[in-house]
C-alpha cells in the first residue's frame, strides 16, 4: 500500500505543480489531482489483484494517496491568525482551506462510490514494538520534511522540521494508544513541537522562524484520512459515519 501510495501521490504532485504553473484554478487543480492520485492507486492495486500478487483488501489505502492535497500550511497559519484575533486573515485562509478540501473530497467520494471502495478503518499492523516505533519515527520525519519542501522551505528547515516531527508525532501516537483522548494527545504534541522549534531557532540565529520549523511537524498530525473518509460518508448520506469518522 505504501509503495502504491508513493507512486500515486508522486504523480498527483507532478500534476499539481504543472497545473499551478499554468495558472489553473486551485479548486480545479485539487480536484484533478485527487482524481489522478486516487484513480492511479485504484488502477495499480486492481492490476496487482488481477495478477494474484496481492489481496483485494489493500484497496482500503486509496484515501492515503490524496493526503498530499491537505493544505496544512494555510490551515495551521489560519488557526494561528484566529488565535491572534486577526480574523480577516484567519477566516480568509480557512475558507481557502475548506474549498480545497471539498474539491479533493469530491474526487475521493466519486471514485469510492463508482468502485464501491471500503471506507473502513484498516486493521492495525502486528509488528514488533521496537520496529513499529522506528517506522513511526522514520515516516514522521520523512513526511514532515516532505511537507516542508512543498512549502518551499530551505533544506536546513526541512531537516529540522523532520527531526521535530520524528520526536513529537510518535509520542502523540503512543499517547493515543495508551488511552489518552486524541485531541488531548494532539494538544500536548503540538505544544511540544512549539517548544522544540523555540529551542532550535536560536541555534541558527533565528534565521529560520518558529513557523517554518513547527508547521511541517504539526501538519503530520492533521487527520487527513479521517476527514476525507468523513466527507465521503457525508456525500453518501451516511451522517452517523460522517460524524464518527
Where in the sequence are the language-model features?
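Alpha-helical transmembrane segments and their membrane-interface boundaries
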Residues: 1-222, 229-245
